[in-house]
Amino acid sequence: MASIWVGPRGTIKDYPGFSPSVDAEAIRKAIRGLGTDEKTLINILTERSNAQRQLIVKQYQAAYEQELKDDLKGDLSGHFEHVMVALVTAPALFDAKQLKKSMKGTGTDEDALIEILTTRSSRQMKEISQAYYTVYKKSLGDDISSETSGDFRKALLTLADGRRDESLKVDEHLAKKDAQILYNAGENKWGTDEDKFTEVLCLRSFPQLKLTFDEYRNISQKDIEDSIKGELSGHFEDLLLAIVHCARNTPAFLAERLHQALKGAGTDEFTLNRIMVSRSEIDLLDIRHEFKKHYGYSLYSAIQSDTSGDYRTVLLKICGEDD
């Protein structure tokens, strides 16, 4: 059975001739030797798929009675450590931890919440919610409820529920009906019916939404994005615009997130690490393509000029190559 965490356009694939015991031993030597052998760690962890890394983690635990992630944490530091630990974490658990991190402490990282909840499939969301509950003994929905409010909260909870239709079939009649519902809920009435926007944008499949946006343009002579900007505001507006962007082109949405993370004075490593790791086996090739198309330079060169040391090396290995 194909994993829901693997797509055809990743930069990292299964390693042929893979042996968990050989890799676990090599990693142990790299960590335990005099000084850490970062090169070996990077090469092994970026040249194995996540499924293979999980087998290394099991083998490592069985052979050395140590958690690989704990040994990595003890031996590495900074952003480099964060990426390496992310690489040995199962995808659903990684996303669960990222969601927790975005809601922890003072202030919520709404952009991270939006990015994760809009780009994961319904089946992925169900696994993430399970992982979240297993680790934190609280439901993801409960934490979202206590950290957000209003229409933004309602929409996030709908996405977190993993109820978006996943079928690739489109229904023209439904698209016309939904387009009219959106038009009546916004442009065509005094005041806005936010629930209708949430219902359509959070539950319909992406191919279905694309058709709905075309129908919307026919009815209103406006792009749905312009109506959302005119009718809504705040984080709820940001969330719905993100859904529209993802429905049209998820890799382009994530390329824009990476561009924002890398441009300007500081680097947003939290976002950079999350997207590079979580999309490395799904669609990072497409994200690279969109990045180059929109910004005129490659993602590889952006990472190269914005990061340094082992952290740069591991990100470039995940990225794959220059475009």
UniProtKB/Swiss-Prot annotation:
The modification Phosphothreonine is found at residue 267. Transmembrane segments: none annotated. InterPro entries: Annexin, Annexin_repeat, Annexin_repeat_CS, Annexin_sf, ANX3. The keyword Phosphoprotein applies. A pair of annexin repeats may form one binding site for calcium and phospholipid. Belongs to the annexin family. Pfam families: Annexin. This is Annexin A3.
